[in-house]
Amino acid sequence: MSEHVIELRSATKAYGKQTVLHGVDLKVRRGEFLTLLGPSGCGKTTILRLLAGFESPTTGTVLLDGQDVTALPPEDRGVNTVFQSYALFPHMTVYDNVAFGPRIKGVGGSELETRVMEALKTVKLDGFAQRKPAQLSGGQQQRVAIARALVNRPLVLLLDESLSALDYKLRKAMQIELKQLQRQLGITFVFVTHDQEEALSMSDRVVVMNAGNIQQIGTPREVYEQPENLFVAKFVGEINTLTGKVCAVHGDGSYDIDLFGHVIDLRARRSFAVGAEVSVLIRPEDLRIWREGEGTVEDLADLFPGTVEEVIYKGTTVDLIVRLTETRELLSTTQFFNEDDASGSLLDYRIGEPVHVDWVHGWEVILPHE
């Protein structure tokens, strides 16, 4: 049995003169929760449609369980799709919606009832079998759509932005339910979203896409903490970008980098030559803020002076926008409440307040400047 349940090989898709996928290679592991993440128009839904059989690649191959299924129609692939709109039949009961697929394939009698009720029980809707879709909440309709896909016992379940129509709290709850369901069933899930937080919280691996190309494939932690290029760094979460120049190379993978007059010894996973322009990337939560009266003159000499331009209270955190004095660049920082600061006064920043900024060296990512 192959480790990979579904695979794209050199898949290209063009509509007339417009190419929306450029020679994509993708292997989906058996039993994993894989998310295709990217902005609108990046090609993620096109990949889903190629896997489902709703579209055929212009060039390239689709394999399912090691077999070439490029020419097979959707009903012969062992793959089911949950659509963004759910596509439930409004005139049918929940039971009949879920039973629709097996009935088409000739399943009936006690076997049909057993399979339908098992699917409804799996999504915790076994008590709703005789209701109509209009009598259900958005989250319940979502679960009916999932049950309708699961009742066919697919090798792979494809989900096309299927949480986007839900409100914030329900969407968060369904993220947890979907991941638990996938783990319980052991079925491969391929999920499409443009929501970075959704991708990071649910996935075993994330495929980051842009302009019809795969930019990076990795675990949520890898794509967040070790982005392979500036697009991934900027699209997956927020990030600050400082442009610098390599002024010395050391043999241990560390470099002296000049950031507008501050020469800092930093380590990089990539190789750079003296004189190379680089982007030093720092997440907002990794920046540290020094206020007036904190640190000695010697401490502050190597830090970046700035001014607080905006204070954004978010309940559990306070976000600051700081304008650097030397370059006029804006940095975004996230400050967390301290349990020893019951009044929250330590995060009581003022617009216009002078501050200094630095970070723990080693938490940055250094990439070639683009």
Predicted features and spans:
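Non-catalytic connector elements of ABC transporters
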Residues: 239, 249-370
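The feature captures the beta-strand-to-loop junction immediately N-terminal to the Walker
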Residues: 37-39
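Conserved coupling/switch loops of ABC nucleotide-binding domains, chiefly the family-specific signature
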Residues: 58-61, 111, 211, 243
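Helix-to-loop junction immediately C-terminal to a conserved catalytic motif
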Residues: 52
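Conserved ABC transporter NBD signature motif
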Residues: 60-68
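ABC ATPase nucleotide-binding domains
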Residues: 33, 74-234
